């Protein structure tokens, strides 16, 4: 924003520059003073009493280039046009030729009135100025010089000028400070008011007897009503505001003993007055003694309560001290320590012994059970018998009831005890089958079954008797089946007594029994046609023992472990291995949850940084707008900064 835009505002709205920056760029058409039509030219810049000189442009052919700048402080340009102000606001440019011997030779000079240049409503003026001769000499062609002049306002120097004004009016707070300082220098009432905080003392209860003497009261009043101890309102405000409420002062007759004694000698007081004074002194001393004890004993008491700092042999700790009717005993921390020592964690109480014994007994049982199987032999054998009986009962339920074990293979595969049991079973089965055949022959009435009684004729049997006999036969067959089942159940139990207790051998025996059953299939003992009414044994749904369920479980578990191992191997192969020098090595060892937490933290920090960057950008934008409005000349400075001219 230039002053040309604000030309219509009038001189009242013009701003006053504090500095001027002069940049000497170049010159042309200079007279040659050196050999070969050259010159070693330099320029001198002067405003008021300050001078600056540029560097020497050696052997220039009448067109030296300097591009050097100098800054001068200006007086107020808008003041009235007096002679000193006009001389201080004139810019003088002098071009000289440097001579090796003697004085430098004059090439030309130019003068610029800065007030007129500022009134031209432009902050920056760049133009060519013609060089002239010295005043009083004939003008010649001396060439031109190009100068860039820029007016500036430094706010710091302007504020310094404002602060240095002597006729500036003081604010009321400054006047108040001056008054307070003057009072402190002249009077000593502030110190007196700080020493004596209040003029209305609180009288102690022992001073009631002193109220009879009116003369003494008047003397005390006159003592405190002296003008040297009175407060002025200013000193009172200074002493009361920064401090808290002062404590009350207890006045005793003993404090004014010497003053009253002197006055008593001067006035020749009676003997009654001296007796009163002696009574007052004794009462004051008696009054101060309990106060001293009250102030001293609580300190010791407080020290004694802090963790038992005193030893047990201390006389004060042993004695029962009575302070204001309260007995203080020093052995309370010891009682607390005794209570702590009698806690169940440290004391060997019977409950603690019982708990420890229980824990140790359970640990011993848990430790001995796998190591010493022989100690609990009775219990383990009973459990094994029950388990084996349940297994064999399941086997017998799954096998058919009419199984004969009479083959040689079965005898070879079994132990001698099992062989005897098997032979007994075959004999019993033969007897039962013969009984069945005889009963069936009786029921059906066929003659070919009864071979022994061929010649004896059978008596005729009615249909009712046949039905009754069939029912009886069915009942007998059911009873025989019930008796036969527990016998077969007991056979493997007896065989297991002699066999080993290894579960794998049990599985082998069961497999052998299954193979024996498959080899020796049961044959019908007698081809006798049966009616549905006389069928004794129902066919079982599972004539063959079911397959062992442990085998597929083992295979499934082995397959699962194999798949897990293969998956782990694949994952290890797919995982990329990082070297310790790689920065990714620090993150390769982290778990999934740790990586998620790390990402969230990084995201939070990035958001905070983005917020800070946004705030800085907004601040810079606002600052740039402010600079453009107030001092746009900063933005007009060219990128190439000129050299500084040397001060002369």
From Swiss-Prot:
One GO cellular component term noted in the UniProt record for this chain: recycling endosome
Composition-biased stretches (Basic and acidic residues): 164-188, 381-394, 422-436, 445-454
InterPro entries (UniProt xref): C2_dom (IPR000008), C2_domain_sf (IPR035892), FIP-RBD_C_sf (IPR037245), FIP_classI (IPR037789), Rab-bd_FIP-RBD (IPR019018)
Domain of life according to the entry: Eukaryota
C2 domain: residues covered: 1-129
One MF annotation (Gene Ontology) recorded for this entry: small GTPase binding
Positions of region (Necessary for interaction with RAB4A and RAB11A, subcellular location and endosomal recycling): 584-648
Biased composition annotated in UniProt, kind: Polar residues: 189-201, 227-242, 271-296, 314-323
Pfam families, alphabetized: C2, RBD-FIP
Record-linked CDD domains: C2_Rab11-FIP_classI (cd08682)
Record region (Disordered): 164-470, 483-503, 516-555
Compartments where found: Recycling endosome; Cytoplasmic vesicle
Domain FIP-RBD: from-to ranges: 576-638
Keyword annotations: Cytoplasmic vesicle, Endosome, Phosphoprotein, Protein transport, Transport
Phosphoserine modification, residue list: 205, 209, 237, 304, 319, 343, 345, 347, 349, 360-361, 386, 438
Biological processes, Gene Ontology terms: negative regulation of adiponectin secretion; protein transport; regulated exocytosis
Major localisation: other
Function as written in the Swiss-Prot or TrEMBL entry: A Rab11 effector protein involved in the endosomal recycling process. Also involved in controlling membrane trafficking along the phagocytic pathway and in phagocytosis. Interaction with RAB14 may function in the process of neurite formation.
Domain remarks in the Swiss-Prot or TrEMBL record: The FIP-RBD is involved in the interaction with Rab proteins.
Subunit organization: Homooligomer. Interacts with RAB11A, RAB11B, RAB25, RAB4A and RAB14.
Protein name as catalogued: Rab11 family-interacting protein 1
């Amino acid at each position: 924003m230039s002053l040309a835009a604000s030309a219509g505002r009038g001189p009242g709205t013009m701003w006053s520059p504090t500095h001027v920056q002069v940049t000497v760029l170049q010159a042309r058409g200079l007279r040659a003073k050196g050999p070969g039509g050259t010159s070693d030219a330099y320029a001198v810049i002067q405003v008021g009493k300050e001078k600056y000189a540029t560097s020497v442009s050696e052997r220039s052919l009448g067109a030296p280039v300097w591009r050097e700048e100098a800054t001068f402080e200006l007086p107020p340009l808008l003041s009235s046009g007096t002679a000193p102000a006009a001389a201080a606001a004139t810019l003088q440019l002098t071009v000289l030729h440097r001579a090796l011997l003697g004085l430098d030779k004059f090439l030309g000079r130019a003068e610029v009135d800065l007030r007129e240049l500022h009134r031209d409503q432009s902050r920056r003026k760049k133009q060519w100025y013609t060089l002239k001769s010295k005043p009083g000499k004939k003008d010649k062609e001396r060439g031109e010089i190009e100068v860039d002049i820029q007016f500036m306002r430094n706010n710091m120097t302007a504020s310094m000028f404002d602060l240095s004004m002597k006729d500036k009016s003081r604010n009321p707070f400054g006047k108040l400070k001056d008054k307070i300082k003057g009072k402190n220098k002249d009077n000593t009432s502030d110190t007196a008011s700080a020493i004596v905080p209040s003029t209305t003392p609180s009288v102690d209860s022992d001073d009631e007897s002193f109220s009879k003497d009116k003369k003494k009261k008047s003397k005390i009043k006159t003592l405190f009503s002296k003008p040297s101890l009175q407060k002025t309102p200013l000193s009172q405000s200074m002493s009361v505001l920064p401090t808290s409420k002062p404590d009350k002062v207890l006045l005793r007759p003993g404090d004014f003993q010497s003053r009253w004694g002197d006055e008593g000698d001067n006035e020749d007081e009676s003997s009654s007055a001296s007796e009163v004074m002696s009574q007052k002194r004794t009462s004051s001393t008696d009054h101060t003694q309990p106060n001293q004890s009250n102030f001293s004993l609580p300190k010791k008491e407080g020290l004694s309560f802090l963790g038992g700092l005193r030893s047990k042999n201390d006389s004060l700790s042993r004695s029962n001290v009575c302070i204001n009717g309260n007995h203080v005993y020093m052995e309370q921390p010891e009682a607390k320590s005794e209570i702590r020592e009698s806690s169940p964690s440290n004391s060997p109480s019977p409950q603690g012994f019982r708990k420890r014994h229980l824990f140790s007994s359970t640990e011993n049982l848990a430790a001995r059970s796998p190591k010493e199987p022989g100690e609990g032999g009775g219990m383990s054998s009973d459990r094994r018998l029950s388990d084996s009986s349940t297994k064999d009962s399941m086997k017998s339920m799954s096998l058919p009831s009419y199984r004969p074990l009479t083959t040689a293979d079965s005898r070879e595969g079994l132990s001698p005890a099992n062989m005897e049991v098997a032979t007994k079973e075959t004999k019993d089965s033969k007897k039962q089958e013969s009984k069945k055949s005889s009963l069936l022959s009786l029921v059906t009435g066929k003659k070919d079954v009864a071979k022994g009684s061929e010649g004896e004729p059978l008596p005729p049997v009615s249909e009712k008797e046949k039905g009754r006999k069939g029912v009886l036969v069915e009942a007998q067959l059911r009873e025989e089946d019930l008796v036969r089942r527990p016998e077969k159940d007991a056979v493997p139990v007896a065989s297991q007594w002699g066999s080993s207790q290894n579960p794998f051998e049990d599985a082998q025996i069961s497999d052998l029994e299954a193979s024996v059953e498959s080899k020796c299939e049961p044959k019908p003992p007698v081809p006798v046609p049966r009616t549905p009414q006389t069928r004794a044994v129902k066919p079982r749904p599972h004539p063959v023992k079911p397959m062992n369920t442990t085998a597929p479980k083992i295979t499934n578990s082995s397959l699962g472990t194999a798949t897990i191992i293969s998956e782990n191997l694949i994952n290890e192969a797919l995982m990329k291995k990082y070297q310790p020098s790689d920065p990714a090595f620090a993150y390769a060892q982290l778990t999934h949850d740790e990586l998620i937490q790390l990402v969230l933290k990084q995201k939070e920090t990035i958001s905070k940084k983005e917020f800070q960057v946004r705030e800085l950008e907004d601040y810079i934008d606002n600052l740039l707008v402010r600079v453009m409005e107030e001092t746009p000349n900063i933005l007009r400075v060219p990128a190439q900064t000129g050299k500084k001219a040397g001060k002369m």
